[in-house]
Amino acid sequence: MRKIIVGSRRSQLAMTQTKWVIEQLKQAGATNEFEIKEIVTKGDQIVDVQLSKVGGKGLFVKEIQQQMLDGDIDFAVHSMKDVPAELPEELYISCMPKRVDARDVLICENGYTFETLPKGSIVGTSSLRRGAQILAARPDLEIQWIRGNIDTRLKKLDSENYNAILLAKAGLERMGWTDRVDFEALDPDVMVPAVGQGVLAIESRKDDAEVTTVLQLLHDDVTAKAATAERTFLKAIEGSCHVPVGGYATVNGDDVTLTGLIASVDGKEVLRVTKTSTDGVALGQAVAEELLGRGGREILASVNE
């Protein structure tokens, strides 16, 4: 029986996610031996700069993908929102386990909520998308950039001058920390999530049939349908971490409903389009085209200047 080498970033969340996938595969009947290989990515080494200023998406996956191409690892577990829309020709997302909660959460000091945070409160986030949507709804708040893993950010809320921070609920869930902090989950109507938020993307080589067969034990078709619509949208607008873009799809029977968002960094311009279709790929493209045609192209051009 072949030993399968799994690549993972060293962060606590990445290792937790990778171990979870291996455990789920074993429970689903995989009899292979698994070994985790820790890989340091460029994104892990840059901790004091806003991600959008150093290359955006791909910062957390390129080194891992290279080891897969070199045959040093057999598959890798990513957070889908870290994975660029374009993948190397020889690799693909071969498995998407069932999605967890895709919403963003606001964690405030002193029991405040999004509605009651006092004017001038400082909200920490690492995401242009989150910052823009916060300012669109509450222009009286101030956004400051914050980096680091979930634990680091929670400590910064206690020790530094942030009044609130924004995180993905999926990260809290996967770390088992939903009871550790009081949080307010923001409805996607208020805060459109990042494309692929709450989805694990398992990437492997297209020519490795054995690994593909093992990974299919965990694949969830509903999750894949939603994520495909979201990622098609992202690819069609050529989105990256440089721009405030959100995309969130839900599946009801054969229907996929996708909301796409493009915003200016200051939140003064926010464009949102929601459409439903049975074809996720066509849907992603249609939402992108409408947003770009309604002024999204100009917003993206101004953000990228």
UniProtKB/Swiss-Prot annotation:
Its cofactor is dipyrromethane. The modification S-(dipyrrolylmethanemethyl)cysteine is found at residue 241. Its EC number is 2.5.1.61. Pfam families: Porphobil_deam (PF01379), Porphobil_deamC (PF03900). Binds 1 dipyrromethane group covalently. The porphobilinogen subunits are added to the dipyrromethane group. PANTHER family: PORPHOBILINOGEN DEAMINASE. This is Porphobilinogen deaminase. It comes from Exiguobacterium sp. (strain ATCC BAA-1283 / AT1b).
